[in-house]
Every structure is written in C-alpha cells, then in structure tokens.
Amino acid sequence: MKSFTLLLSTVTLAAVIGAILTTPALAGPREDIIAGFTAQGAGPADLANGKRMYETTYGTGKPDTPKCTTCHGATPQEGGQTRTSKAIEPMAVSRTPARFTDKAKVDKWFLRNCSSVIGRECTAQEKVDFISYLVSQ
C-alpha cells in the first residue's frame, strides 16, 4: 500500500508540475513574440530554414551586407561586429539569454536587417524560423 501511495503522489506531483510548466500565463516574452508572429500566419518553426537564413548569401539586399554572418559571427555562438567595428553579442540564445525578449528590439532589428540583407521585410514565418533556430543554439 505504501508503494501505491508513493506512486500516486509521484504521478500527481508530475501532473501538477506539467500543468504549471505549460500554463500560458507563465510563457516568457520570447514565447509571446513568437505567438504574435503565429497570429500573423506563421506555422510551426522550421529550424532548418532558420539555419539556412542565417548562413545564406542573398545578394538581394545591400552589397555590403550580403548575409547575416557579414556582421554576426560565422556561427551563432560567436560574436560579431558592425561595419563600424562595434561589438555584437552572439546570436545564440545559449550565449545571449536576453536575445529576442524585447518586442520593440525584435521588430526594429528584423525590419532593418531583413531589408539590408535580403532586400525586403522578413515574413512572420521567416521570423519564427530564425528565432527558433537561434533559441536552439
């Protein structure tokens, strides 16, 4: 009987913890930002597309910024620098935990960098893919 009670207590505790961790009210600002892009029509994240976006040489934006890695590190874990030699923290969320948590900054930098690198504004789907890839790094 003791083992059954212990098992029942463990299962109940696991269920409570699971419910707490998946409660939308506990979602963080990054998840809220992704939810906003989902509301604009983005589907599930495609990490491979996010990686492809980070590494692709586009040639459709400004000539001096043909790809993300022109200013950001060759890998998301590396820092980079602007064309004026100002340091840029790594894009990987594992290295820069506050990355993609401020909606105003996310909107500003996607608008500026997508226009500069790709030559157009990124779609909601591209933003979800890009953010999700960098969260995974």
Residue ranges of model-derived segments:
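Bacterial N-terminal signal peptides
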Residues: 9-20
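Sec/Tat signal peptide C-region and signal peptidase I cleavage site
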Residues: 21-27
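The canonical Cys-X-X-Cys-His
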Residues: 65-75, 130
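Short cysteine/histidine-rich zinc-coordinating motifs and their immediately flanking basic loops
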Residues: 80-87
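Short microdomains enriched in Cys/His and/or Lys/Arg
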Residues: 89-104
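C-terminal capping alpha-helices of c-type cytochrome domains
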Residues: 107-137
